[in-house]
Structures are given as C-alpha cells and as structure tokens.
Curated annotation (Swiss-Prot):
A Gene Ontology BP annotation from the UniProt entry: tetrahydrofolate biosynthetic process
Keyword entries, A-Z: Hydrolase
Pfam families, per database record: GCHY-1
GO molecular function: GTP cyclohydrolase I activity
Enzyme's top EC category: hydrolase
Catalytic activity: GTP + H2O = 7,8-dihydroneopterin 3'-triphosphate + formate + H(+)
Biological or metabolic pathway of the protein: Cofactor biosynthesis; 7,8-dihydroneopterin triphosphate biosynthesis; 7,8-dihydroneopterin triphosphate from GTP: step 1/1
Keyword presence, Disulfide bond: no
Top-level taxon of the source organism: Bacteria
Protein name: GTP cyclohydrolase FolE2
Coiled-coil segments: none
EC number(s) stated in the UniProt entry for this protein: 3.5.4.16
Length: 304
C-alpha cells in the first residue's frame, strides 16, 4: 500500500508545550500483543512499555518509538541483555524527555512434565511476568511466576487418624486380632472412615534477579520450588501415579506457613536470586476463605 503523497511536514502535537506543567511518573502503552520465547517456550505474550516524562513542559512522549523498539523481542528468547537494550532504546528515543524506562512482559510458559511413575507426560502452564526498569542507577529486573501445587492440612490429617483409631477400637474391642483381619479392615471403607481435607494451592513468586545472568533460569527456579513443596500438580496420570501423588501428599502435610518457609529456604540457596517476595495461597476446602502467608528476603517495596 502506497503512502499518501504530501509535500508538507505532518505536524506532531506531542512536540508542543503543555498548558499545565509537571512531571509524570509513567507514560506509555499497556497490553500490547507481543510473541516472544521464554524458557524455550513460545509465549503468546503481552507487553507494557513506558517512560517517565521528566520534561515538565513537554506535552507528551513518542509512543510509536516505544512500540517499534519492541520488534527486537519478537519470537526471540528473552534475555536480560536483550531487555536492557530495548530499555536503552526507549531512553535514547526520548532524550531530554525521560530519565527512566519501564518494560513488562507477561504470558504463560508451557513446560512438559512427566508423570510420577508411569511413562505418561503432559503440559503445564506457568503464568510468568518480567518487570524491568532502567534508570540512572542501572537496570532492575523482577521475574514473577505462579506455581500450583497440592496441600493437605496437618490438623485435618491428625483428626482423620484419630477417627480411624476410634473406629478400630470399636470394631476390635474384645476380639482376637489377626494380621489378616486388620489388613482386611484397613482395606475397607471403615479403614478410611475419615480423610483429611486438601486444596489446590499456589505459590506466587516475585524474584529480583542478578543483573549478570546470561540466560533466565525460569525452569530451574520452578523446579527448585516444586521440589521443595513435594506436591506439584500433575498432568496425564495412571492409577499408579495417582497413588504416588496421594503418598506425596501424606508425606508433605503443610499449613500455608510451612509452605512459605520451604519456598523461602529453597530460594535463598539460589545464586541467581538477589531478593524475593513470596505469597502462598491455600484455597481452603474447609472454609470459604483462603489461608495466606508471605515471605520476604532482601526485598524492597519499590522493586519494579
């Protein structure tokens, strides 16, 4: 398509002066469609791009320059150096107007996960976001990841065991006890008279990354947290996998406080992480509300 011929220079009102003066902390665009790659996964992503408007008399910024700078990320594996180059381009294209640049990327990372025992496997989606900022102090990057897992209430498990003990006492009082009789009883519905309540839970991670990383260790960090919790959500399973999952839940009884401490200790051991904020959410099946715990380490509220 040919551009319309026009011998006159098109006027850009953004270059004009504002009637009301004053700096603006952030000006830009949100929810921009942008395909990129993260953790070797193609992501149908979204981007937010902006800069501060520090020239108090300037009417506005050049949003098209931010939009065009994002082309460098299309279909490419996201790296901190690549994000830094885009942020520098944001600032270079707004020389004299802006001192701080911002870039957020978000989308689901797909990772294929094997079953616990059988050869089956399936895909899991991990919502991820990268929130980056470039200013006179340098570049800061925060990786956000949401990880789903299962949690079984320790209190409920203890009450369930007590109920089973009481039922055992009632059924075997004044009776000779044989190994076969007990084994049969344990395999009956009476032997599992009560079950502890469990819930699908989430760990929301905000991780301040070391600025010298060549690659983003998204999968490794997810693996670290899932290993610490011990009850990662499954994909395709057979009965043998479901049995193994039940065993994992029984061996990893967790209040939200327990889960938060497990994740905290696991992340503190990762050199790639310089600080973090963790939000643990157990969507209670007993109550209509959620049980929540937060953990922080070397975290500042003004992280991007």
């Amino acid at each position: 398509m040919q551009e319309p011929k026009n011998s006159q220079t098109l006027h850009d009102v953004a270059n004009g002066a504002s009637d009301l003066e004053g700096p603006l902390a952030w000006v830009g665009m949100e929810d921009i469609a942008l395909p990129f790659r993260l953790a070797n996964s193609a992501v149908n992503g979204r981007a937010s791009a902006g800069v501060s408007l520090d020239a108090t008399s300037a009417r506005g910024i050049h949003m098209s320059r931010l939009y065009l700078a994002l082309e460098a990320l299309e279909h490419e594996e996201v790296t901190l150096s690549g994000l830094g180059a885009v942020l520098q381009r944001f600032l270079a294209s707004h020389d004299g107007l802006a001192r701080t640049a911002f870039l957020d990327l978000s989308g689901d990372v797909l990772i294929k996960r094997p079953a616990l025992i059988s050869p089956r496997a399936g895909w899991k989606a991990y919502p991820c976001a990268l929130r980056c900022r470039q200013d006179t102090q340098g570049m800061q990057a925060v990786l956000e990841v949401t990880i789903g897992y299962s949690s079984t209430c320790p209190c409920s498990a203890a009450l369930a065991r007590q109920s089973i003990q009481q039922a055992f006492d009632e059924d075997f009082t004044d009776m000779p006890i044989s190994h076969e009789a007990v084994r049969t009883w344990l395999g009956s519905e009476q032997g599992i008279l009560a079950t502890p309540h469990s819930q699908r839970s989430q760990a929301h991670l905000s991780l301040r990354l070391a600025d010298d990383l060549e690659t983003l260790p998204v999968t490794a960090l997810i693996d670290t947290v899932e290993d610490a919790l011990g009850t990662a959500l499954q994909t395709a399973v057979k009965r043998v996998d479901e049995q193994a999952f039940a065993l994992a839940n029984g061996q990893n009884l967790m209040f939200c406080e327990d889960a938060a401490r497990r994740v905290r200790h696991a992340l503190q051991a990762r050199d790639e992480v310089q600080g973090f904020r963790v939000r643990i959410v157990h969507a209670e099946s007993l109550h209509a509300h959620d049980a929540v715990a937060h953990a922080e380490w070397n975290w500042t509220p003004n992280s991007p």
